[in-house]
Regions:
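N-proximal low-complexity "stem/linker" segments adjacent to membrane-targeting elements
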Residues: 1-47, 51
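C-terminal catalytic/acceptor-binding lobe
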Residues: 2-5, 163-234
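Polar low-complexity intrinsically disordered regions
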Residues: 13-14, 46, 75, 87-89, ...
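Anion (oxyanion) recognition and catalysis
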Residues: 32-35, 91, 194
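Conserved acidic residues
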Residues: 39, 67-69, 96
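Active-site nucleotide-sugar/metal-binding loop of Leloir-type enzymes
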Residues: 54-68
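Conserved catalytic core of nucleotide-sugar-dependent glycosyltransferases
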Residues: 57, 79-174
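Short beta-strand-to-loop acidic/aromatic patch adjacent to the donor-nucleotide binding site
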Residues: 65-77
Length: 234
């Protein structure tokens, strides 16, 4: 009987010089307790996110021989349990690229920010091709999507190989356009993935926390019934 090779993983993130302690706690916990064979971490420091990601993916592909790369944002709160939801869904052939779910808001630093999942479908807009969020988000569902944030994304090495073959010389990450036509580096990457005909899968049960600032004011207090709303949580 031929012994099957154990697949390996590296983890990558970008930061501006500092990371949240909850992020690092989650990474260490996952490295130690997930039971997966890790082959190192990759970090890019700076403020040009597209350039940082491009540097990381090339460094990983050229120098790190792990089968899979886990992309994390440096303010994500990962756990071994949530990571394993993605890891156990992976398949180098059929599911080479998959994302979990974290939440952002179009109203940063407001007292009652509406949380929205960073999972998208491509859509035609008046100003051209754009994206729309998957909202409401279906619970405990494994489905194909068009794009996502890069904050909790698992990628097989073959994804980069296939992009190189289908679109030689094209950067993996770039920021293009301006104003309403601006496309961030993460959506650009998934547009490239889509053009290379690589599917992106999403497990909506693999949700992780996202450390963000918000204004904890009276509106927030009122949302919990002037303090009474916590009674049902105890």
């Amino acid at each position: 009987m031929v012994k099957q090779k154990k697949e390996t993983l590296a983890v990558a993130w970008c930061d501006n010089g500092m990371v949240d302690g909850k992020f690092m706690e989650g990474v260490v916990d996952t490295l130690i307790n997930s039971g997966v064979e890790f082959c190192g971490s990759l970090r890019a420091h700076g403020n040009q996110i597209a350039q940082q990601r491009e540097t990381l993916v090339n460094r990983w592909y050229d120098n790190n021989k792990s089968d899979w790369l886990l992309w994390l944002d440096s303010d994500i709160m990962i756990t071994p349990e949530k990571f394993l939801k993605l890891w156990n869904r992976r398949d180098a052939v059929d599911v080479p690229l998959l994302t979990g779910v974290y939440f952002t808001s179009d109203q940063p630093e407001q007292p009652l920010m509406r949380p929205l999942a960073t999972v998208y479908e491509f859509a035609e807009l008046p100003e051209g091709i754009g994206i729309r969020r998957l909202d409401p988000l279906p619970k405990n569902t494994f489905l194909k999507v068009s794009a996502a944030g890069m904050g909790f994304c698992l990628m097989h090495r073959s994804v980069i190989t296939r992009i190189k073959e289908a679109l030689p010389g094209v950067p993996f990450f770039a920021e293009v356009g301006a104003n309403k036509q601006f496309t961030g580096e993460d959506i650009y990457f998934f547009a490239v993935v889509n053009k290379a005909e690589i599917p992106l899968w999403c497990d909506t049960a693999a949700t992780v926390g996202h450390m963000k600032r918000f204004n904890m004011g009276e509106d927030y207090y009122d949302a919990f019934g002037r303090g009474k709303g916590y009674a049902g949580l105890s």
